[in-house]
Curated annotation (Swiss-Prot):
SS bonds (residue pairs): none
Coiled coil: none
Record keyword tRNA-binding present: no
Gene Ontology cellular-component terms listed: cytoplasm; cytoskeleton; nucleus
Protein name from the UniProt record: Profilin-3
Sequence similarity: Belongs to the profilin family.
GO biological process: actin cytoskeleton organization; positive regulation of actin filament bundle assembly; regulation of actin filament polymerization
UniProt gene name: Pfn3
Pfam families reported for this sequence: Profilin
Localisation: Cytoplasm, Cytoskeleton; Nucleus; Cytoplasm
Length: 137
């Protein structure tokens, strides 16, 4: 998992993905790697805390922020055993799908291009976090 720059480049080869970030969630709640100049590089430690925190009820009702962009949560199985994915959509006219995948040490956050359905990102995140989990074990 050492070469995140190459990993980010590989993920961005998928033309449906506009932005990607790898974010620590256990010891170091910061962005480890992201698309240069991308919006997701601005994910804050507070946002990571909300995503991985025990209070799921509040952000399911009020939404959450990812890199300062307000989002509606569509599906939350981020902390569920065997799934580990949260689907959201940014609010506003330029609404985009956002999908967050959970691994033992990091979150993988993808933002789709305009018009890309969240289900496509969900499948991509499941595939990617499966590979990351295998590397960790």
């Amino acid at each position: 998992m050492g070469d995140w720059k190459g990993y980010i480049s590989a993920v961005l080869r998928d033309q449906r993905i506009d932005d990607v970030a790898i974010v620590g969630h256990s010891d170091n709640r910061c962005v480890w790697a992201s698309r240069p100049g991308g919006l997701l590089a601005a994910i804050s430690p507070q946002e990571v805390g909300v995503l991985t925190g025990p209070d799921r009820h509040t952000f399911l009702q009020t939404g959450l922020s990812v890199a300062g962009r307000r989002c509606c949560v569509i599906r939350d199985y981020l902390l569920a055993e065997g799934d580990g994915v949260l689907d959201a959509r940014t609010k506003g006219l330029d609404g985009r799908a956002i999908c967050v995948g959970h691994t033992p040490r990091a979150l993988l956050v993808l933002m789709g291009r305009r018009g890309v359905h969240g289900g496509i990102l969900n499948k991509t995140v499941h595939d990617l976090i499966g590979g990351l989990r295998e590397q960790c074990s």
